[in-house]
Amino acid sequence: MLTDNKPVGCRSVVAFLLSCIFLTGFIGLSSANAAEYSYQGTEPCSSIQQLSFDSTAANASITWQTDLGPRLPGSNASAELRNSITENLTAFNFEESSHFRENFTLTNLIGTYSPKNSTGQNVVFVAHYDSRYIAERDYNESKRNQPIDGANDGASGVAVLIELGKIIPNLQLNHDVTLFFTDAEDQGITGGFHPLTWSYGAYAWVENLTEDYKDNISAYIVIDMIGDAYLDFTKIKDTSAELWETVTPIAAALGMMESELDCEGNYGRAIYDPTKTRGVIDDHVPANNAGIPAINFIDINYGENASTFGGHWHTHNDTADKVSAESLGYIGDLLELGLITSAWILVPTDSNDNANTVDQDESVLLQHDNAVEDVEKNRFVGYISIILVSIILVLILIADISLKL
């Protein structure tokens, strides 16, 4: 129990001052670490004439890939596909990452294009390049244990990323772009619920990322099973709502939404429906779980009038003739237009006005620099406050010792 009223009053005042200083310090540090950012892409119709994605070449790539044979983890076909990708996309810095899982070794292929004026932000495009090791849904029971071609489920996403990679160096971007070809996405166990046996490659990649690398990923965009001649896709559960908001104006501009006008003033086709949400276990899950903003363009109704996860999915009918160059073109244009309009790049929300008064590239760089400057100022205030608190604590300790003496 305290018996001296004067020290009690003094300490109360000191405690109040300490609380104020601590609050100031933590607000400063909190502001430094919690700057608000948002996606603010430019109007897409003004850039639509710049699109150069080659859907015919993408379609030809699917035939070439399936002719390699099943792209199972550790197979010669997989190695040949990876070699072809690296040889054709020389502007990207590629690396392979191998991981042992159960009874096989998977190999991820990661390529990054980083322009000289890069702000450091990174848009990651993801497609699995492995094909399914069994055809468990095939009507012919005698063939269910045989691997499938995987023209749509595997080759279609790879084909789009390859052709996108060819044109990315010409888009005059000011941020990094990573093409992530995942292995062992489609080697999951059927029967029962075994979610962790799917997307092995994506899980392995995310688990080995540094915090700095994750923080620089502004968008992680998966494309899977997007070659169906009867293409349709929706939002996907466990993804970034903010990223989906960027998709709607781009898809509408390209004529992919029947309820919206395209750039020519016509209503589009029923390809993308943002009013619906489907659930699927795929390569977006590990990224989303790690706090990385992720979305997934995936058509889970493969074939004309196909039901969900029905039609040609995981059957021997998943062949190159079921894939459409037009569908590949829609997705390729969607990704390219998103890059051109900076739809998937984060900018500070309090710098919106600046973006309308300067050139787009210069604006992003200026906003980035201003944000860094504000962060450093807030951190400085926080650190000074904490130093003052430390000094006062020492003075209190000295005062207490003096009183006791």
Annotate each predicted stretch with a short phrase.
Residues 55-61, 66-67, 92, 107-182, ...:
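Catalytic-core environment of secreted peptidases
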Residues 47, 60-118, 268:
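A non-catalytic alpha/beta surface segment that caps or lines the substrate-entry region
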Residues 57-67, 76-88, 93, 156-163, ...:
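Extracytoplasmic/secreted proteins, especially bacterial periplasmic and envelope-associated proteins
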Residues 1-40, 351-358, 362-405:
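Secretory targeting signatures
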Residues 71-73, 100-104, 116-118, 129-133, ...:
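Solvent-exposed loop/turn segments at secondary-structure junctions
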Residues 146-250:
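Acidic/histidine-rich catalytic neighborhood of metal-dependent amide-processing enzymes
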Residues 35-82, 305-322:
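N-terminal capping segment at the start of a domain
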Residues 226-350, 358-359, 366-367:
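Active-site-adjacent substrate-binding region
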